[in-house]
Curated annotation (Swiss-Prot):
NCBIfam families: StyMonoxStyA. Styrene monooxygenase which catalyzes the first step in the aerobic styrene degradation pathway by enantioselective epoxidation of the vinyl side chain. In a two-component system, StyB reductase utilizes NADH to reduce FAD, which is then transferred to the oxygenase; the electron transfer is proposed to occur via a diffusing flavin. This is Styrene monooxygenase StyA. It catalyses: styrene + FADH2 + O2 = (S)-styrene oxide + FAD + H2O + H(+). SUPFAM superfamilies: FAD/NAD(P)-binding domain. It is an enzyme of class 1 (oxidoreductase). GO terms for biological process: styrene catabolic process.
Amino acid sequence: MKKRIGIVGAGTAGLHLGLFLRQHDVDVTVYTDRKPDEYSGLRLLNTVAHHAVTVQREVALDVNEWPSEEFGYFGHYYYVGGSQPMRFYGDLKAPSRAVDYRLYQPMLMRALEARGGKSCYDDVSTEDLEGLSEQYDLLVVCTGKNALGKVFEKQSENSPFEKPQRALCVGLFKGIKEAPIRAVTMSFSPGHGELIEIPTLSFNGMSTALVLENHIGSDLEVLAHTKYDDDPRAFLDLMLEKLRKHHPSVAERIDPAEFDLANSSLDILQGGVVPAFRDGHATLSNGKTIIGLGDVQATVDPVLGQGANMASHAAWILGEEILAHSVYDLRFSEHLERRRQDRVLCATRWTNFILSALSALPPEFLAFLQILSQSREMADEFTDNFNYPERQWDRFSSPERIGQWCNQYAPTIAA
């Protein structure tokens, strides 16, 4: 008998899982409250970059609509402010790519439906889960909407924060000239905030995502509270002023006459994220085990761009485990966690560490930045390992590991 899988949520996790399962003729139904043709009128959903490991999965799923060789980027520029600013660059071994999710998500939804996946357009609440679980061999929850996240118990040891660590201002902009190499820029203004600049394909072609991770109480926090719609010119002037002061390596490429939101006033998000890590399964009152996937298991701040990439990874692993098993109980969830947890948990821990380190600036982290800025080999490793958060956590998980890493690359610094 053909397996039947129910998926609640049509984000990257749910849709990558659905597409994987349809490749293996598994019956899939996705529950979502949005139809594909509704996305174009939505506010910006996020500013997500897909690293090469995720692009490879998209190739395998035959949904690589925008090849990274044409639309992607090839490395990271870094800027560290202070009395002696540091500028340096690191290469990616294979390009990453960012596409406006208002284009990307409906493409995935249409691909899934074209391949025989079913879609049910409706809200799903916690009260619906038990009934849905009876209809499928396995129910997978991929969204925290409507309190669905509370079904999965939060792990306090992996959820150190009770409130947002940054006041976010995120938008898609035009009027920013590309750097000599199409690349992300990661700019750090000590004590004030971080900026991640991401070349991003949107409705009108290539644009620039600016992810401003403003420290709460800093000179930059005002950007998270000033509304574009109240006075667009005043907002843009404030943004330019703050970028020139805190993130000059980006500001110097802006044409003030052209600088604006890329498409419309819907191209901006402001607010904050409370990072959390939850159990990857829950047992309902009817005895059925359900699986949590993507953001509902691991919610991370966007500073390192790990959310969608670890969600896609976990979806692929879950798909393989669904194929390998026929009973989806607590023991199944243990098999799943054994395979997916290292990357998902390391992405969470690494992101949380960086949030804290960029605020507190402990001496071992400052030493890391100094060596990183002078060793191209170290910068290349650090940059490419955005694909592999478990490798990053191997480097950052203790002061001793950071010190050993710095000692490894110190001899590579040019005299």
